[in-house]
């Protein structure tokens, strides 16, 4: 897990330096008038979080009414269990809260829809074989394709999809 965490730190630093919000995103974020909290359930080893968290940070910095907070999934099982994806503790999961009342307004995650489909297809393909070597290769190939997709998308899907549910 430590190797994944180090790799993800590198990814996050790169995205923090290079990712840019779209004008549409900036305009939408400016409309947030009531204080909201984006609670991110994550872990350091999570590759999707490495792609998503820097974008959320940039977005939250655009408006003082948005607070970004983090919970570690494995230390907060009751929270993640209330926000399962396909009966799994998939992360990152972002919960949008009314800051004053702590009412859950919405949630998003663990990844953009197109990437989610890629992950689910790869899981189904891996489960279709009893060959453990092939299953591992499918997993490695899927991870490579996933990060290539994120690089080509340049955070646009994250911005667009999250804004749809982020109460902005």
Task: Please annotate each region the language model reported.
Residues 16-19, 31, 47-50, 72-75:
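A short linear-motif detector with a strong N-terminal bias
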Residues 27-58:
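Local sequence-structure signature of Cys/Sec-based thiol-disulfide redox active-site neighborhoods
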Residues 38-43, 56, 64-79, 90, ...:
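Thiol-based oxidoreductase modules, predominantly thioredoxin-like and allied folds used
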Residues 1-35, 62, 81-88, 103-168:
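Non-globular targeting/processing and membrane-anchoring segments
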């Amino acid at each position: 897990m430590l190797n994944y965490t180090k790799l993800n730190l590198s990814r996050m630093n790169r995205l923090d330096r290079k990712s840019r919000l779209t004008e549409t995103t900036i305009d939408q974020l400016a409309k947030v008038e009531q204080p909201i909290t984006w609670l991110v359930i994550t872990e350091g080893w999570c590759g999707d979080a490495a792609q998503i968290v820097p974008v959320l940070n940039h977005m939250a910095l655009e408006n003082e009414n948005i607070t970004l907070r983090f919970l570690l999934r494995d230390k907060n099982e009751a929270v993640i269990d209330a926000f399962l994806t396909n009966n799994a503790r998939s992360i990152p999961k972002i919960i949008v809260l009314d800051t004053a009342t702590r009412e859950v307004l919405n949630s998003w995650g663990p990844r953009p829809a197109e990437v989610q489909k890629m992950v689910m297809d790869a899981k189904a393909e891996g489960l279709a074989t009893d060959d453990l070597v092939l299953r591992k290769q499918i997993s490695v190939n899927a991870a490579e394709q996933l990060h290539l997709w994120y690089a080509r998308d340049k955070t646009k899907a994250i911005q667009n999809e999250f804004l749809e549910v982020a109460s902005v």
